[in-house]
Every structure is written in C-alpha cells, then in structure tokens.
From Swiss-Prot:
Molecular function terms from GO: DNA-binding transcription factor activity, RNA polymerase II-specific; RNA polymerase II cis-regulatory region sequence-specific DNA binding; zinc ion binding
Keyword Repeat attached: yes
A Gene Ontology BP annotation from the UniProt entry: regulation of transcription by RNA polymerase II
Protein name, per record: Zinc finger protein 83
Length: 516
C-alpha cells in the first residue's frame, strides 16, 4: 500500500490526473509548464485561489502557448474527479460565455483562455511579443515617443496610464506598500522590493569589473560608469554631460530655477524630492543609516557611504590630470580646480573669489568680524579653527613639520613649504605688474596689494584699513593694550612681533659682547 503511494507520488502530475500521455499532449504540457508554480490539491497546492489577484492575468505565456484551442469546456471537466466536484462548495469564478462556475482561479483561467483563443501580438520595430493588443499599443509608444497621459498637477506626461498613476502618488503622498520588517511605506511595489533587500542583505547584482555587489540593478548600471567613464546624458542648455539621467534631471532645474518640493514644517523649498526627504530628517532627527563596522548612524545614505571608506580605505575618484585619488567625489571636484584655476564662489562684500565654498565661508567671517575660536591660554580669538590650532603651537612650542634636507622644524606646514624653497631656489609666483617673483603664493597676494591699493582688513575701533591681516592684528593691540609676544630671555611682553624681534637682537648683542 505504501509502495503504491510512493510510486504515485513519483508519477508526473499528468498521470495523477488520469490523463493519457498520448491523447492529451496539450493538457500535459500545460501542467508540466505550471508544475513549478501551481500544485494540484492532492499534492499540497502551494498557491491558493485567494492569492491570485486577477486570475486571468496570472496565467503564464507558456500556458497560453500550450493550450489547444480546439478543446471545448469538457476539457476542464476532465481534469476533476467526481469527488473533487462534490467538494467544490462555493463557486467563486463564473464564465460569462457559458455560465460555467469554478471554485479555483487557475481552473477558471484555463477555461477562459479556451474561449478567448488569445492571439500573440508582435511589435514590428523590436519583435517583442504581447498577449494583448492594448499591451502592444502601450509598448509601441516607447518607439514613437508618444506620451498621451498628462498629470493635472505638474503637467508631466507619460507613455502609460500605470506610470501616471504611480507618479500621482508624489503629489498625493499616498504610499500603499508597507515593509513588514520596519514599517516603512512606499508609493511603488518595486521600491518596496528593493528596500526589503536592506533587511535580507541580498545583493544579486555583481560588477564583472571589480566584483562589487549591489541591491539594485540600477545601482550596478550607475557604478559601471566609473569604469567606463561614460557620460551619455547631455544638457541641451549648456552642453554639460552626466553619467546618470538623474544627475541631468537635477542639473536642468538649475536652468529653470524650479523648486516644487516644500517642507510642511518650515516652508523651505527644494529642487528635488530627495533633498526634501533629507531635509525633513533635521526636524524628525531620524538617522536610518547605520555603519555595521562601528555602529555610527547617519541621516543620509551618502554620508554612510562616505564614512564607510574610512574603514575600507577605498579611494575610487581619480584625477585624470595628475593621478591623485580621493575617497569623495567632492574632494576630486575641489582638487580639479587647482588644474583649471576655476574659482566659482564670490564674496558679495569685496568681490574676492574662491575655489571652494568653505573658503568663502571662512572669508565672510572677516567681514562679519566674528571670531568664535578662542585660545584657552591667552584669550586671543580667531575667525578660523585652523588659525587657532596654529596659534596654540606658540604656547606648546610644538613644531611638527620637519625639513628632510636640513632637519629644521616648523610650527606650520606653510612655513616648511616656504623654507623648502631656500634649498630648491624656486620662486614660482611672479607679479604681472612689476615682474617680481615670490616663493609663496600668499607673498605674491600680499605684494599685489601694493599695486592695487587694496586694504580689505579694517579696524572696528578706529576705521583704519590694512592690506594684511597680521598688520590689523598688530594694530588692534594698540586699542586693547594686549601684549602677546613674550621674550624668552627676560619675560618682557610686546604687542607687535617686530618689536620682539628687535628686542631679541639686544640680548644677542649682549651675548656677543660677553663672548668677546
């Protein structure tokens, strides 16, 4: 008895259903094709009728191909035993052609295909095949460029009604697809599927070039452009090219000035919905991106990616001019301006231009008079933290920069660079006005003010202006009475470094006379 049962289970589905392999070939092919998806009731059916959202749409093209159109309704009858018919109970699916009713969605779908005798519709352009004429018509709009479906909110047009429906959720805020793991909601089911890979850790898309793996195929496609250097997306306005279409779309808004996305909390507007989403985390305090290595959390995914390179040491961005590599794209962009000489950031106060926005921000503090960085030793304040760090070495005596040629040490890297030119004799910076050459760019910049008469550093006390910041600092000591410069020999204090230098010559002269 058990042996027969085992034998029966080893039989293909077609034999268990009582069909003859020779006389019912189309039917057998049908169940063979669907064997991986649907199992018969007596074989622990894996997909029940309630999971079929729309049975006629769930049947595969393989099934449609293999069902013989010559079989009448009694074909489906032959698939069920009398016992099964008795157990059907409520009949959920009814055929509109003949009124025949079915309990299971799959059986109803099979029956419908026999009636409709569906034809395959082929695209003349690319050869793609569709089971419905409407699907073919929708597909052909890709080739023709026709976009008949328009959004009433923003005027954006689409090939398909389904794409318009998805787009509308941006305006309505509807997010019907929820992650069972973390409760996050999405406006598209594909976005939910992609998101769920974060929880599962699944990265099915691998780069053949470097072996890096990705959650999404779009991320792999974007990554590949790093290896190829391809930038297929060009701006029609200014000719700038981009590796990703999303970058081009973002760039185009610069020309239009459009900011359609508004924060409901503070009213701030943004060019892109992604920027709005990132901004809103300021209000919520949400930091959903966590580093698996050290546990640090971030509000933006890009911040996590940048942080992760601290652990990996990865530097994927290479300068084509000099070969220098960088961990961040922004660092490469900033570096590239050394070669191009581009300075896109301009001060509205004095017109001075800078290669980096951070340099402009530092410069603006000069005009504001703000000095937020204060020395704990002498209470001297600075507009930049780097200046405070450099100043603090006066108190500590630290000189971390050493000349490899003569062993002399310096408190600042710029001093070492200046000193190094004594050994090389290099004077790379030339004044276009008088031809004088300088070892440092800063020295040339100071010198140029002789020709221009520029005095950007103004005293808030008396209004006197200076061409150099150090001159203003020294002058300011007249008003405050401060004396920061101390003689190590006798402890005498001076408000100007030049006075200290002169004074130290007095000690040097005394020592010389003593020796004599």
């Amino acid at each position: 008895m058990h042996g027969r049962k085992d034998d029966a289970q080893k039989q293909p589905v077609k034999n268990q259903l009582g069909l003859n392999p020779q006389s019912h070939l189309p039917e057998l092919q049908l169940f063979q094709a669907e064997g991986k998806i649907y199992k018969y009731d007596h074989m622990e059916k894996s997909v029940n009728s309630s999971s079929l959202v729309s049975p006629p749409q769930r049947i595969s093209s393989t099934v449609k191909t293999h069902i013989s159109h010559t079989y009448e309704c009694n074909f489906v009858d032959s698939l069920f035993t009398q016992k099964e018919k008795a157990n059907i109970g409520t009949e959920h699916y009814k055929c509109s052609e003949r009124g025949k009713a079915f309990h299971q969605g799959l059986h109803f779908t099979i029956h419908q295909i026999i009636h409709t005798k569906e034809t395959q519709f082929k695209c003349d352009i690319c050869g793609k095949i569709f089971n419905k004429k409407s699907n073919l018509a929708s597909h052909q709009r890709i080739h023709t460029g026709e976009k008949p479906y328009k959004c009433n909110e923003c005027g954006k047009v689409f090939h398909n009604m389904s794409h318009l429906a998805q787009h509308r959720r941006i305006h309505t805020g509807e997010k019907p697809y929820k992650c069972n793991e973390c409760g996050k909601v999405f406006n598209q089911i594909s976005h939910l599927a992609q998101h769920q890979r974060i929880h599962t850790g699944e990265k099915p898309y691998k780069c053949n070039e470097c072996g890096k793996v990705f959650h999404q195929i779009s991320h792999l496609a974007q990554h590949r452009t790093i290896h190829t250097g391809e930038k297929p997306y060009e701006c029609n306005k200014c000719g700038k090219v981009f590796s990703r279409n999303s970058y081009l779309v973002q760039h185009l808004i610069i020309h239009t000035g459009e900011k359609p996305y508004r924060c409901n909390v503070c009213g701030k507007v943004f060019h892109h919905i992604s920027h709005l989403a990132q901004h809103q985390r300021i209000h919520t305090g949400e930091k959903p991106y966590k580093c698996n290595e050290c546990g640090k959390v971030f509000s933006h995914k890009s911040s996590l990616v940048n942080h992760w390179r601290i652990h990996t040491g990865e530097k994927p961005y290479k300068c084509n001019e000099c070969g220098k590599v960088f961990s961040h794209k922004s660092s490469l962009v900033n570096h590239w301006r050394i070669h191009t000489g581009e300075k896109p950031y301009k001060c509205n106060e004095c017109g001075k231009v800078f290669s980096r926005n951070s340099y402009l921000a530092q410069h603006l503090i000069i005009h504001a008079g703000e000095k937020p960085y204060k020395c704990d030793e002498c209470d001297k304040a600075f507009s930049q933290n780097s200046h405070l760090v450099q100043h603090h070495r006066i108190h500590t005596g630290e000189k971390p920069y050493k000349c490899d040629e003569c062993g002399k040490v310096f408190s600042q890297n710029s001093y070492l660079a200046y000193h190094w030119r004594i050994h090389t004799g290099e004077k790379a910076y030339k004044c276009n006005e008088c031809g004088k050459v300088f070892g440092l760019n800063s020295s040339l910049a100071h010198h140029r003010k002789i020709h221009t008469g520029e005095k950007p550093f103004k005293c808030n006390e008396c209004g006197k202006a200076f061409s150099m910041r150090s001159s203003l600092t020294n002058h300011h000591a007249i008003h405050t009475g401060e004396k920061h410069f101390k003689c190590n020999e006798c402890g005498k204090l001076f408000r100007d470094n030049s006075y200290l230098v002169r004074h130290q010559r007095f000690h040097a002269g005394k020592k010389s006379n003593t020796c004599n």
